[in-house]
Amino acid sequence: MNFATKIVILLLVAALILAVTSEKGDSSSDDNEAKETEGELPLSDFYGSCVRPKKCKPHLKCNAAQICVFPKTGR
């Protein structure tokens, strides 16, 4: 084997290793995306939904998505 062939094989092995490790990272990034989505509406978990029998706390109102939000900001 000449030097160029060794370099090509080394690059292929490195690409294979990167592909395998990035696939493992993708599954954990899905979990992170789910956590980020949960973090977008922090009041919904804390105050709950507006669906009966649960009601919003007095200083909040129910929006169209049935989530308790601040009346002025809608968040």
Curated annotation (Swiss-Prot):
- Keyword Disulfide bond in the entry? The reply is yes
* Organism the protein comes from: Opisthacanthus cayaporum (South American scorpion)
Task: List the disulfide bonds in this chain.
Answer: 50-62, 56-68
The record's function comment reads:
Insecticidal toxin.
Enumerate the UniProt keywords alphabetically. Disulfide bond, Secreted, Signal, Toxin
Q: What tissues has this protein been observed in?
A: Expressed by the venom gland.
Q: Give GO MF terms, alphabetically.
A: toxin activity
What highest taxon heads this organism's lineage? Answer: Eukaryota
Q: Does the keyword Chaperone apply?
A: no
Q: An example Gene Ontology cellular component term from the record?
A: extracellular region
Instruction: Specify the protein name.
Output: Insecticidal toxin OcyC10
Q: Where is the signal peptide?
A: 1-19
Principal cellular location given in the protein's record = secreted
Q: Where in the cell is it found?
A: Secreted
